[in-house]
Amino acid sequence: MASSKAAINLQDIFLNQVRKEHVPVTVYLINGFQLKGTVKGFDNFTVVLESESKQQLLIYKHAISTISPQKPVIFSGSEKDDKKEE
């Protein structure tokens, strides 16, 4: 039954929170580059980042190592789902 239920996607929850709250992030790529800005959108394969100079960057997720927010992200939706599974 767990397979038919929508699985919690922590990645989507995280990206959506930083997008909605306009939290500045640092994106570390696997080649060592660092990109700073705010998340404007994302899908299954890409993240759109708006840099501090207002340039929009389309980043492929397979090139991302880490995304570090400048402030803690509250995972409000995941707590409700955790309680439902108990």
Curated annotation (Swiss-Prot):
Which InterPro entries does the UniProt record give? Hfq, LSM_dom_sf, Sm
User: CDD domains, per this entry?
Assistant: Hfq
**Pfam families referenced in this protein's UniProt entry, alphabetically:** Hfq
GO MF terms, alphabetically ordered: RNA binding
> Any one Gene Ontology biological process term?
regulation of translation, ncRNA-mediated
What SUPFAM superfamilies would the database entry show? Answer: Sm-like ribonucleoproteins
Key words of the record: RNA-binding, Stress response
| Sm domain span | 12-73
Q: Name one GO cellular component term.
A: cytosol
* Family named by the database record: Belongs to the Hfq family.
Instruction: State the oligomer form and interacting partners.
Output: Homohexamer.
Described purpose of this protein according to its UniProt entry: RNA chaperone that binds small regulatory RNA (sRNAs) and mRNAs to facilitate mRNA translational regulation in response to envelope stress, environmental stress and changes in metabolite concentrations. Also binds with high specificity to tRNAs.
> Would you tell me the protein name for this molecule?
RNA-binding protein Hfq
Originating organism: Caldanaerobacter subterraneus subsp. tengcongensis (strain DSM 15242 / JCM 11007 / NBRC 100824 / MB4)
Which gene specifies this protein's sequence? hfq
